[in-house]
């Protein structure tokens, strides 16, 4: 096809305004229509990337049955704690919270993040049964346990996760069962499953138009004057304002992004078997369970990533390929 003659920018305006995300915890705006009872997402931490050799299982591929080099991402999966349950009612203005119940015993580090209610102020499970007829959604309030990882912090992240199921009563029964307990990645996902990843991307700071939007670098007179890396025209004389569509300098990176249809290649409980020699760059050793995802995952090392059941997965024609080898060689450049 070749290059377009008119190319004012290389970035999509659908993501505007490109400003910094408010929180490091991504906001989950949609959920899969899954009737399986259980959590529909799981928060993890990005450790780093490596490569693997997979046995190609596509019969139409010229590499069928052969080893194929594939980049993979390793995510550490410390157990999460279910701290509370929240019920929602569907109204004309969106979801409305009906009530919430918290576990009797809460981790002391959770008080670094939230103002915890006193014991005599906490609601019991009877408060859930009183409004269950109005409820349309059941969600679990879970928090991570970063102190069990190599990340130097104690304050946990709090994530609200929808509970799937065929009926509200079935979801609520499961929520009561897991309240106050810890869950592992194996309780939510399994190897071969297709998932989505939600995270805040790596921040780049304030960048110019060429790097931020991919506009053309001007040569000739503009370059000789030292103004080659700027927008040639930012608009007409009238109307006397600059349109929001003009590619201008500004914040680049640190945005929430969702990547769809990633495949889980492997789940494990021993982090030592996946940690490369010398540890992952800017992360260190994996101390808990882990999950290996095919391809890349947005964000730098130590970034919180939410794994969600796929909301737009196509038919899985070939299934999980055989993993022949996962590299644990040093990433230090030695």
Swiss-Prot record:
The region called Disordered is annotated at 1-21
The UniProt entry's GO CC annotations, sorted and at most eight, read: cytosolic large ribosomal subunit
Gene3D superfamilies, A to Z? 3.30.1430.10, Ribosomal protein L3, domain 3, Translation factors
Which keywords does the record carry?
Ribonucleoprotein, Ribosomal protein, RNA-binding, rRNA-binding
SUPFAM superfamilies recorded for this chain? Translation proteins
Q: Name one GO molecular function term.
A: structural constituent of ribosome
| GO BP term, example | translation
Biased composition range(s): Basic residues: 1-10
Pfam families named among the record's database cross-references: Ribosomal_L3
Q: What does this protein do?
A: One of the primary rRNA binding proteins, it binds directly near the 3'-end of the 23S rRNA, where it nucleates assembly of the 50S subunit.
Name the NCBIfam families on file. L3_arch, PRK04231.1
User: Subunit arrangement?
Assistant: Part of the 50S ribosomal subunit. Forms a cluster with proteins L14 and L24e.
Q: Which family does it belong to?
A: Belongs to the universal ribosomal protein uL3 family.
Protein name, per record: Large ribosomal subunit protein uL3
Taxonomic source organism: Methanococcus maripaludis (strain C5 / ATCC BAA-1333)
Q: Which gene encodes it?
A: rpl3
